Amino acid sequence: MQAEAIFTGTEMLLGQIVNTNAAFLGRELAAAGISLYRQVVVGDNLVRIREAIDNARRRADLIIVSGGLGPTEDDLSREALAAALGLPLVEDPAARENVTRYFAARRRPMTPNNLKQALLPAGARAMDNPHGTAAGVFLEHEGKVYALLPGPPREFEPMLVNQLLPRLEPYGARREIIFSRVLKIAGIGESGVEEAVKDLLHSDNPTLAPLAKPGEVTLRLTARAKSQEAARSLTALLEITIRERLGDYIFGTDDDTLESVTGAILAARHLTLAVAESCTGGLLAHRVTNIPGSSDYFLGGMVTYSNEAKVKFLGVEPEVLAARGAVSPEVAAAMARGVRQAVGTDIGIGITGIAGPGGGSEEKPVGLVYLGIDFRGQVEVRRELFMGQRENIKWQSTQSALYLLWRSLRAQCE
């Protein structure tokens, strides 16, 4: 069953509210095995809502409209559906009962315009709405299924789950199980990931969808099958192929983060960590300590923002700072070594860079970051050049530092 969704409301187009119904609808239809191919947002205009319905019914088997079922003049979804299908609006006893019951239960007077909510296109059935005055609308017409649902999420969500989805079972909704698995990737950009899996992106079942985030790329593998085991098997086969190509960059799955994965390895191997930060201002330590149980492996951190602090607390040589500058591979290495020795850990990480917006030069532009890691005396330095605002550069710096830690742990512990 192929579906399209139309969300009505000028306030969404103006950015005054966020359309959370779209995400909820997508998840629920996917779980029910219904393919949602298109979502559109339309303002509170009769002509445009009708046009959206006309366009959708030429392509889809199921057309869902959210919003526009209230009592005011700009609530136009019932009128638009009736006009699109050439049907009259008639009063529905069940819809009228929904309105009157709502006001009676709250001992509030009902104004006459509320009875507009009892009007349905001829042949439609009302869907009960215990959370509001507007009944939903369910209509089969000329081989298509139409559903009108209220816009407020507290009404939309229960009506979708409790009223609409059960009604769709006789109309060919697939009862397949949908299983998704997410692969988490770092250390390589979105273009590099897509190049590695471009021949797999057109797979129909399972599907493969990349998504880029700052310092990370995710690959979502989604399979449909008659059972959970069969769906898992399909994604597992695809995952094997992807890992053969990108295994050096896949650090986790599903809800894993770099800080949770590296933390688990540190704890399992009884290794300890300390960090020295300059441009990130403590963000790396913050992320590491967000993980429950991090006190088992994280012993401490320092924010050495000034050159004087780097010399005093980390033992960075003044001559190195004078000759190479604070943002240099030599200083990153010295920071990692200094914090490891000062705190007494197995591993030390040092971060130094230019987060901006000022402070950059042609030789050392904004976004230049050096990351150092000292693993029991073995030092490695990584150079990065990030783009974006100050907060984004700081985040990507910590992401790269955690990836460097993950990679070092893999190399040392294999």
From Swiss-Prot:
Pfam families attached here?
CinA (PF02464), CinA_KH (PF18146), MoCF_biosynth (PF00994)
Domain of life of the organism in this record?
Answer: Bacteria
**Which portions of this protein are annotated as coiled-coil regions?**
none
Family annotation (PANTHER family): NICOTINAMIDE-NUCLEOTIDE AMIDOHYDROLASE PNCC (PTHR13939), NMN AMIDOHYDROLASE-LIKE PROTEIN YFAY (PTHR13939:SF0)
Report the Gene3D superfamilies cross-referenced here: 3.30.70.2860, CinA-like, MoaB/Mog-like domain
Q: Which InterPro entries match?
A: CinA, CinA-like_C, CinA_C, CinA_KH, Competence-induced_CinA, MoaB/Mog-like_dom_sf, MoaB/Mog_dom
Q: What name does the UniProt record give this protein?
A: Putative competence-damage inducible protein
The gene designation is cinA
Q: Which family does it belong to?
A: Belongs to the CinA family.
